[in-house]
From Swiss-Prot:
Catalyzes the initial step of the lipid cycle reactions in the biosynthesis of the cell wall peptidoglycan: transfers peptidoglycan precursor phospho-MurNAc-pentapeptide from UDP-MurNAc-pentapeptide onto the lipid carrier undecaprenyl phosphate, yielding undecaprenyl-pyrophosphoryl-MurNAc-pentapeptide, known as lipid I. Keywords: Cell cycle, Cell division, Cell inner membrane, Cell membrane, Cell shape, Cell wall biogenesis/degradation, Magnesium, Membrane, Metal-binding, Peptidoglycan synthesis, Transferase, Transmembrane, Transmembrane helix. Pathway: Cell wall biogenesis; peptidoglycan biosynthesis. It comes from Mycobacterium marinum (strain ATCC BAA-535 / M). It is a multi-pass membrane protein. The gene is mraY. Belongs to the glycosyltransferase 4 family. MraY subfamily. Its main location: membrane. GO terms for molecular function: metal ion binding; phospho-N-acetylmuramoyl-pentapeptide-transferase activity; UDP-N-acetylmuramoyl-L-alanyl-D-glutamyl-meso-2,6-diaminopimelyl-D-alanyl-D-alanine:undecaprenyl-phosphate transferase activity. The chain crosses the membrane at residues 3-23, 55-75, 80-100, 117-137, 156-176, 187-207, 231-251, 255-275, 280-300, 334-354. GO terms for cellular component: plasma membrane. Disulfide bonds: none annotated. This is Phospho-N-acetylmuramoyl-pentapeptide-transferase. Its cofactor is Mg(2+).
Length: 359
């Protein structure tokens, strides 16, 4: 627990202190966010707000994770693990794709950055590298950072994927989560606040897995997860970085995370869900993100097949703005929904453990 608190503290400090420096730098460079002309009228006043704040979030995550391990040398903490590095690497790789996208938008003063093909190739490449590496690096107990078995709270033994199918599965998971968080990042503080809660839930889940790991505590209900404590540090650092960034990103936002932040954060959820064996449970924890990307898919499919729209605008947080909800009302209600789904997800996780031990 001490390591988790250190990770949160370092990440919050780095993010909250670095963000205003980025605001000044990007403002001086003229790196202002471009607003869609067909968006809600209330958003036009945000034109010119600095973007690429995701740099501060990634810096906070890196500092929180590696800073905690450096501090751990003083009290014999666990070392850096393959699982932690793979999740961090996935997030950083996706953040790099987002950074290029943001940079093109800002340099060309338009709302379109990388073309869809280039962006998709970047996401797929990141996912494939992660998928291939995450089944390697077995520890002395024979555990790899991930399993080829589909997982809810632990592996579902009846659903085992071939290596090729596992790679395809990871591509779908990474693409879905990175785009889901990207679509959600359309209102001040919405994505950062929701991410802080989802990763906070993952801190609880992975910390519990660490205390009930089959390697150290074999018995009913134990978890075959490699490096759960290190995954908890990644989750804690992410939550802390989002909280620090939210100080400046809350309405009215002084800076936006941009694709640099949203794609990286989506990678965090994808990476944590695969390495903690909770791919299906993640859908409950991040249900708001799932709803956002689903609204976009429904809007596109319905319009192409019927010529009609389900929502006034997608992602559907904009729909609520256009029907009269104030932006802050949408944000707070979506935060509340995320808190509920995170609570439900943690309850399902703990309930499964109780059932496993026969309680």
């Amino acid at each position: 627990m001490r390591q988790i608190m250190i990770a949160v503290a370092i990440a919050v400090a780095v993010s909250i202190l670095l963000t205003p420096a980025l605001i000044r730098l990007f403002t001086k460079q003229g790196f202002g966010h471009q607003i869609r002309e067909d968006g809600p009228p209330s958003h036009h006043s945000k034109r010119g707000t600095p973007s690429m704040g995701g740099v501060a979030i990634l810096a906070g995550i890196w500092a929180g994770y590696f800073g905690t391990h450096l501090a751990g040398l003083a009290f014999d903490g666990e070392g850096i693990t393959a699982s932690g590095l793979l999740v961090l690497g996935l997030a950083t790789s996706l953040g790099g794709v987002g950074f290029l996208d943001d940079l093109i938008k800002l340099r060309r003063s338009r709302n379109l950055g990388l073309n869809k093909t280039a962006k998709t190739v970047g996401q797929i490449t990141s996912a494939v590298l992660f998928a291939v590496l995450v089944l390697q690096f077995r520890n002395p107990a024979g555990l790899a950072p991930a399993s080829a078995e589909l997982s809810y709270v632990r592996e579902i033994a009846t659903v085992t994927l071939t290596p090729a199918l596992f790679v395809l599965f990871c591509v779908l998971v990474v693409s879905a989560w990175s785009n889901a968080v990207n679509f959600t990042d359309g209102l001040d503080g919405l994505a950062a606040g929701c991410m802080a809660m989802v990763t906070g839930a993952y801190v609880l889940i992975t910390f519990w897995q660490d205390h009930n790991a089959c390697v150290t505590a074999p018995g009913l209900g134990c978890y075959n997860v490699r490096d759960p404590l290190d995954l908890a540090l990644i989750a804690a650092a992410t939550a802390g970085a989002c909280i620090g960034f939210l100080w400046w990103n809350a309405a009215p936002a002084k800076i936006f995370m941009g694709d640099t932040g949203s794609l990286a954060l989506g990678g965090i959820i994808a990476g944590l869900s695969v390495t903690s064996r909770t791919e299906i449970l993640a859908v409950v924890l991040g249900a708001l993100f799932v709803a956002e990307i689903t609204s976009v898919v429904l809007q596109i499919l319905t319009f192409r097949t019927t010529g009609r729209r389900v929502f006034r605008m997608a992602p559907f947080h904009h729909h609520f703005e256009l029907v009269g909800w104030a932006e802050t009302t949408v944000i707070i209600r979506f935060w509340l929904l995320t808190a509920i789904t995170c609570g439900l997800g943690v309850a399902l996780f703990y309930g499964e453990w109780l059932a496993a031990i026969g309680a």
